[in-house]
Structure formats: C-alpha cells, structure tokens
C-alpha cells in the first residue's frame, strides 16, 4: 500500500512541469472567417436554404484585407460573403456571414 502511494507521488512529481509555461497570445481570426474547424473557408455564395446550404459558391480569386474586404470582393460578382464549413462543387455547406475585417 505504501509502495503504491510512493509510486503515485513520484509519478506526479516527474509529470509536473518545473516552470510554468507561458502561453503566447494568438489571433483567433484569420481574415473574415474564424480559424476553427467549422466556418473557416471564405466563399462568395448565391442564394441559400436555411443557412445550411448555399448555391453558386466559389472561392474568391483575390485575397481579402481591411482595405479590400471579402464582402466587397463578393459584391463585385453579385454574391454574398460567407464562411463555410465545406465548399464542394459550387455548394457551400453550413455557412455563416463573413466577419468584418
């Protein structure tokens, strides 16, 4: 019993970091879309159904920036700026409005 307790204590002492590590701040946004798993693909899309499926989606040819936001790039083509989870064959799946830059 004492050996088990001693081994558990030794394991915890070895596993504990010597110094507290610093977490560097990171930007969670990469352009008009979040950097998560969902809604991370910038798309210019046409009409949509219930915010789940959008038609006529295409990846913009230009890189968006604060000077030239995705909304402006898509509006020039008559489309809406969206952030989609998946873009396949002109369809945008699980899309939300793009964030302002």
Curated annotation (Swiss-Prot):
Signal peptide per UniProt: 1-15
Q: Which Pfam families match?
A: Hydrophobin_2
Q: What turns on this gene?
A: Expression is highly up-regulated in the presence of root and stem powder of Shanxin poplar, but also under carbon or nitrogen starvation.
Q: Any idea which UniProt keywords this protein has?
A: Cell wall, Disulfide bond, Secreted, Signal
Paired cysteines (S-S):
33-83, 44-74, 45-57, 84-95
- Tell where it localizes: Secreted; Secreted, Cell wall
Q: Single GO cellular component annotation?
A: extracellular region
Q: Do you know which InterPro entries this protein is assigned to?
A: Cerato-ulmin_hydrophobin, Hydrophobin_sf
Family classification? Belongs to the cerato-ulmin hydrophobin family.
Partners and quaternary state? Homodimer. Homodimers further self-assemble to form highly ordered films at water-air interfaces through intermolecular interactions.
| Function summary | Aerial growth, conidiation, and dispersal of filamentous fungi in the environment rely upon a capability of their secreting small amphipathic proteins called hydrophobins (HPBs) with low sequence identity. Class I can self-assemble into an outermost layer of rodlet bundles on aerial cell surfaces, conferring cellular hydrophobicity that supports fungal growth, development and dispersal; whereas Class II form highly ordered films at water-air interfaces through intermolecular interactions but contribute nothing to the rodlet structure.
What is this protein called in UniProt? Class II hydrophobin 5
Please name the source species.
Trichoderma asperellum (strain ATCC 204424 / CBS 433.97 / NBRC 101777)
Quote the gene name from the UniProt entry.
HFB2-5
